[in-house]
């Protein structure tokens, strides 16, 4: 009988220290399900569009702060793949902020010049899909077979949930797509957090 192999870290060029490290390591595992829960709540009318706007602003700040604080830690391997997701996701999230400002008329110049619904759709669908390649890469680099499968399932849920939400045509269908994405990405980020 072969003893179970200890999970190896597949990244970590520089180990950071300090009180913020635990939050940086575990924060995504809390924020991912929260973000998709808020999105589903907005579709169902439980969360106001203003609250969703505030969530976009807060998330934009958190993304920039997270990547700035973790820049050196995310220089290679799996963490570099996730840094690229954050770097691509920050302007996408900001597009959502601008979309809300244009749609609500808070900035009159945006309301006339910016396609609000298109920007909101870019933010919504991009965050459904952006993590998928990083989940695949993480799964390929993760030596623990059960956990690596979770990464691949997370990628599949991201793509399938996006398709469900895009093709649904109903509130219930859109929420089902969000739930599929949220469940997959939450499982994947929990597995990735364990890998880190």
Model-identified regions with their sequence ranges:
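Membrane-proximal helix-loop-helix units in multi-pass membrane proteins
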Residues: 83-152
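Membrane-interfacial loop-to-transmembrane alpha-helix junctions, especially the N-terminal start
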Residues: 25-30, 53, 75-87, 145-154
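C-terminal ends of transmembrane helices
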Residues: 65-79, 136-142, 186-196
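N-terminal topogenic module of multi-pass integral membrane proteins
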Residues: 1-77, 195
């Amino acid at each position: 009988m072969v003893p179970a192999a200890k999970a190896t870290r597949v990244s970590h060029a520089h180990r950071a220290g300090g009180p913020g490290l635990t939050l940086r390591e575990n924060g995504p595992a809390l924020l991912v399900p929260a973000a998709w829960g808020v999105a589903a709540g907005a579709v169902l009318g439980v969360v106001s569009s203003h609250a969703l706007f505030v969530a976009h602003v807060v998330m934009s700040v958190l993304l920039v702060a997270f990547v700035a604080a973790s820049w050196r830690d995310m220089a290679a391997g799996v963490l570099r793949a996730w840094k690229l997701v954050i770097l691509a996701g920050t302007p996408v999230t900001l597009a959502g902020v601008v979309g809300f400002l244009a749609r609500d008329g808070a900035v009159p110049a945006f309301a006339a010049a910016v396609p609000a619904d298109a920007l909101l759709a870019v933010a919504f669908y991009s965050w459904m899909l952006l993590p998928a390649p990083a989940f695949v890469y993480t799964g390929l680099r993760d030596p623990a077979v059960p956990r690596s499968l979770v990464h691949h399932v997370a990628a599949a849920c991201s793509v399938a949930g996006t398709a469900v939400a895009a093709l649904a045509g109903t509130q219930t269908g859109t929420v089902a797509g969000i739930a599929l994405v949220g469940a997959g990405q939450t499982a994947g980020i929990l597995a990735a957090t364990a890998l880190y």
